[in-house]
From Swiss-Prot:
This is Large ribosomal subunit protein bL35. Residues 1-21 are annotated as: Disordered. Belongs to the bacterial ribosomal protein bL35 family. The keyword NAD does not apply. GO terms for biological process: translation. Gene3D superfamilies: 4.10.410.60. GO terms for cellular component: cytosolic large ribosomal subunit. Keywords: Ribonucleoprotein, Ribosomal protein. It comes from Streptococcus pyogenes serotype M18 (strain MGAS8232). Coiled coil: none annotated. Residues 1-16 have a biased composition (Basic residues). The keyword Nucleotide-binding does not apply. PANTHER family: 54S RIBOSOMAL PROTEIN BL35M, LARGE RIBOSOMAL SUBUNIT PROTEIN BL35M.
Amino acid sequence: MPKQKTHRASAKRFKRTGSGGLKRFRAFTSHRFHGKTKKQRRHLRKADLVSSGDFKRIKAMVTGL
């Protein structure tokens, strides 16, 4: 059976944390900030962890993580 290839787009978007989680950055941060409040923009700057439901799927796509 051939080796499973790493999904390159996913490998660039997720990083492993020290405790074993997956770090991701938030969506809606590239443009159209005039429609968002200052609080929304501030919260969008922070990274977040991948939810437990998505963790298994992403881990399978990115074999090196």
